């Protein structure tokens, strides 16, 4: 090393070349924050997601909501024209697989006994007239299970367009796609009163990218400023201020540049790397500079190049072991996160550890090289300044504390020691302190919530968060969860038994989980097809009511197409299981009573298809008959009772009236299950009926069935109005429990989609957190055991770190800060940095123990030598991370707060728990090999020179 330092320009040139090389790589770094990127690609959740997309299409959704602010309804000719233009232009985009909107979504209807598929506008018959607007609204009402709060909101003022994005598209491509979509929407809606909101995974990723760039441009200069101020206060010299800073800036460029070179994606958690390196990595340079000034102050005579080199080498020799040990332990703390299955945590751990290693390397090479180039005539000034350094800083700190009344004039330097004596100075006190930590931590940890929803990263007042909250409140929700129901053979999913169970599952989930906004599946289409195929035939030219009643019934608008599409029912008119009585019990039984199935099966025995009488013949006759006012009120009263009496809603009353006549086929909006209602002899033939429906259906079911004619697997789409992974987890568990109890044998259910991935990530965060903590604590134990040649050293050194982690989780629990992908790094930071304080104290205590057998004296001297340094370093690191409080992201603000707290607790515990245990247990590894030579006390109260 000495020979190398004689040629400092070799070191400086090499470092400069490497820095320029990595700096040039920074421009190619890719910023991305998609859920798919975070998950392990070999994990079950990720593999299932991709298999599902290969079969059913992409699950990357991008929503556009349009809200009218002046009209009573968004359904106007002008707005429909805007929606149609946006739809058509978006369909032309290469990365868009599908577009669903008010103008192109499928509408299933029956005409003259045939099954037809069209759109809500009516195809070529659409003219934009007021009558057309009414027909569109009536069609939306006609199929509530499909369109309610999807195509049109409850108040009629909001509609949405759903775009399906190609899952193979990169983050860069999605950013460009989003720009194109924004331009299309802006151009189409220009001059209208429509308020536009965009949401979905691509929008979230782009918003995170934008906010990250703002953070990096703001926070890095701030943390640099904090470090500069801290270093200048410490050294009062340019070398002492800028050399440690230079090493961490270069190490940051190397670390992030290497990420870009290796094509590692820069995520939100990676944005903490520069802050962490600048805040933590400067410690090594500070050690080098401090010992350099100390060695310089001890040098005698005229300074020469050779003597200056000896001073530098002396400083390196004195500090190299301590710096190396501190660096290794810090690296070990960060490396522990590599055990996580989550990709962003792995990359954060790897490149932060590399950055720390780079900072360590540069501290022992670049700083000495630059110091060696210092002109000899300026070294004297540095020497003079360094001789006054310790006393000046000490007096300033003491004067400040005395000024504010925090200490008396006699005890300023003993404050950390006095704090130790108060909390852990006796065996009783250290025991009570540990018990208090355990009890308080246990209470707080019980309150800790594990939730990995990425929406929580955004402030509530951010535009994206407001848009998502608006859609969750007014439409079906932005959180998409999917279930896959799989049989054993092709055609298994046409059997009435499983279709009935799937329908029951949907109703059960909706009732038990109010956060669900909508469930759509294969059964939704089967029920609709069954309905339109059983609409009673009407005589268009027959007067339905007596002349005396014409005026009364004219006020009831049944539409202009003989009742084929319209009814005067409201939102729940066409739900076959909507009455309150159906949901008396929140358990499974109210949705799938086995007795109901048995009764239905028993009633099917002996049933003959030849003896079947089509009830629609009677329904058609009733619908074509004249009705008196008295008969109408009898019908109304009957419907009122059937709908629940005093608890009845208008919607349910109308529904019961419609069912009495099978109006618009409403009595057949069901899974064909009851054999007596159909011209079949067995339930197996009902399966054939479903297959015939699929054959007749001219639309596509690719999103919901793997095979349109004989499906083996179907997909259920669940839209959730809440982003919490706790809600998602409950829905998934409810579905699995229901399926286990009520699905026929041979059928399975699995969850997938982005919501399921976030839920799975929550479990991974917990397991990776426990693994990384165990790994890092083990590393601490091994390092300390080897360093002090005793396993007791490992145990004692690990205890304050364990307590620090427990207190961190306690604070998170009480402060309602969720444990998620980002906050899971705190424990590793606590161990990686906190171990430095432990080692520093143990090393000094052991050195003092070799000089004295009086434990109080040893402890007090240890505090005098190491206490202030530990506190200062903790303060510097805490302030460095505290700049995260100015982040655009809520979660990074939490990280800033937590790291600051962790620095306080880890340093405090190192200065209380460790000396308390050492003085109570008196472990043998602290005993000196040679009996210490006692000192004589000087009159000034300072220890005499060591002998």
Regions found by a protein language model. Give the residues of each.
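Extracytoplasmic
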Residues: 47, 54, 92, 97-237, 249, 679-780, ...
């Amino acid at each position: 090393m000495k020979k190398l330092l004689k040629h400092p320009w070799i070191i400086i040139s090499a470092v400069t070349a490497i820095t320029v090389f990595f700096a040039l790589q920074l421009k190619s770094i890719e910023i991305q924050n998609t859920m798919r990127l975070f998950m392990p690609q070999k994990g079950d959740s990720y593999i299932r997601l991709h298999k599902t997309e290969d079969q059913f299409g992409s699950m990357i959704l991008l929503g556009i909501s349009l809200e009218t602010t002046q009209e009573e309804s968004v359904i106007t000719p002008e707005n429909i024209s805007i929606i149609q233009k946006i739809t058509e232009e978006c369909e032309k985009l290469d990365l868009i697989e599908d577009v669903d909107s008010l103008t192109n979504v499928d509408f299933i209807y029956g005409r003259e006994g045939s099954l037809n598929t069209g759109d809500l506008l009516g195809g070529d018959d659409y003219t934009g007239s007021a009558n057309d607007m009414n027909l569109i609204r009536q069609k939306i009402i006609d199929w509530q299970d499909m369109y309610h709060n999807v195509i049109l909101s409850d108040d009629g003022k909001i509609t949405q367009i759903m775009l399906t994005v190609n899952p193979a598209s990169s983050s860069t491509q999605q950013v460009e796609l989003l720009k194109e979509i924004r331009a299309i929407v802006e151009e189409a809606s220009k001059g209208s009163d429509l308020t536009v909101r965009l949401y979905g995974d691509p929008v979230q990723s782009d918003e995170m990218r934008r906010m990250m760039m703002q953070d990096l441009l703001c926070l890095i200069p701030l943390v640099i400023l904090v470090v500069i101020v801290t270093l200048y206060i410490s050294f009062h010299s340019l070398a002492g201020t800028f050399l440690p800073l230079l090493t961490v800036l270069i190490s940051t460029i190397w670390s992030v540049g290497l990420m870009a070179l290796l094509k590692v994606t820069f995520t939100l958690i990676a944005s903490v790397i520069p802050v962490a390196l600048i805040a933590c990595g400067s410690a090594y340079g500070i050690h080098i500079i401090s010992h350099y000034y100390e060695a310089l102050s001890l040098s005698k005579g005229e300074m020469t190049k050779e003597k200056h080199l000896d001073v530098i080498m002396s400083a390196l020799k004195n500090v190299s072991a301590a710096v190396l040990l501190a660096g290794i332990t810090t690296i070990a703390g960060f490396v522990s996160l590599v055990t996580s299955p989550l990709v962003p945590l792995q990359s954060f751990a790897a490149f932060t550890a590399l950055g720390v290693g780079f900072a360590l390397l540069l501290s022992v090479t670049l700083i000495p090289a630059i110091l060696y180039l210092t002109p000899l005539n300026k070294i004297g000034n540095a020497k003079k300044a360094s001789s006054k350094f310790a006393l000046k800083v000490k007096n300033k700190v003491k004067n400040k504390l005395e000024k504010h009344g925090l200490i008396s004039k006699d005890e300023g330097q003993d404050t950390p020691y006095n704090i130790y004596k108060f909390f852990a100075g006796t065996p009783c006190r250290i025991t009570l302190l540990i018990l208090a930590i355990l009890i308080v931590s246990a209470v707080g940890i019980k309150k800790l919530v594990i939730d990995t929803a990425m929406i929580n990263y955004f402030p509530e007042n951010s535009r994206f968060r407001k848009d998502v909250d608006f859609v969750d409140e007014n439409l079906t929700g932005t959180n998409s969860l999917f279930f896959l129901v799989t049989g054993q053979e092709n055609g298994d999913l046409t059997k009435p038994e499983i279709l009935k169970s799937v329908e029951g599952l949907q109703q059960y989930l909706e009732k038990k989980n109010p956060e669900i906004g909508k469930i759509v599946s294969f059964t939704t289409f089967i029920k609709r097809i069954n309905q339109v195929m059983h609409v009673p035939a009407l005589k268009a030219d027959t007067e339905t009511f007596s002349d005396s009643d014409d005026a009364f019934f004219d006020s009831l608008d049944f539409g202009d197409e003989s009742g084929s599409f319209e009814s005067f029912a409201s939102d729940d008119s066409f739900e076959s299981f909507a009455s309150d009585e159906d949901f008396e019990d929140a358990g499974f039984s109210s949705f799938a009573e086995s007795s109901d199935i048995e009764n239905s099966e028993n009633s099917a025995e002996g049933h003959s298809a030849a003896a079947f009488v089509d009830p629609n013949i009677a329904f058609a006759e009733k619908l074509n008959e004249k009705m008196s006012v008295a008969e109408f009120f009898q019908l109304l009263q009957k419907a009122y009772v059937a709908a629940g009496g005093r608890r009845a809603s208008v919607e349910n009353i109308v529904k019961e009236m419609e069912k009495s006549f099978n109006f618009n086929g409403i009595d057949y909006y069901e899974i064909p299950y009851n054999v007596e209602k159909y011209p079949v002899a067995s339930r197996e033939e009902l399966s054939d009926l479903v297959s015939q429906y699929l054959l007749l259906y001219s639309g596509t079911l690719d999103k919901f069935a793997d095979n349109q004619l004989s499906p083996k697997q179907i997909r259920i789409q669940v839209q959730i109005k809440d982003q919490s992974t706790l809600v998602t987890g409950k829905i998934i568990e409810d579905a699995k429990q229901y399926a286990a109890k009520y699905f026929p044998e041979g059928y399975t259910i699995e969850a997938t989609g982005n919501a399921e991935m976030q839920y799975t990530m929550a479990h991974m965060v917990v397991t990776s957190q426990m693994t990384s903590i165990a790994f890092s604590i083990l590393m601490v134990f091994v390092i300390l055991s080897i360093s002090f040649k005793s396993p007791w050293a490992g145990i004692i050194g690990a205890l304050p770190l364990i307590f620090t982690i427990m207190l961190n989780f306690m604070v998170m629990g009480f402060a309602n800060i969720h444990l998620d992908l980002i906050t899971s790094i705190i424990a590793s930071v606590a161990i990686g940095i906190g171990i430095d304080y432990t080692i520093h104290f143990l090393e000094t205590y052991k050195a003092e123990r070799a000089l004295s057998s009086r434990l109080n004296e040893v402890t007090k001297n240890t505090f005098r030598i190491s206490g202030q340094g530990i506190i200062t370093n903790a303060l510097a690191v805490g302030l460095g991370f505290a700049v995260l409080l100015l982040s655009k992201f809520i979660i990074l603000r939490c990280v800033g707060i937590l790291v600051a707290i962790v620095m306080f607790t880890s340093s405090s515990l190192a200065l209380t728990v460790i000396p308390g245990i050492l003085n109570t247990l008196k472990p043998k590894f602290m005993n000196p090999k040679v009996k210490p030579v006692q000192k004589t006390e000087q009159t000034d109260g300072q220890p005499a020179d060591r002998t």
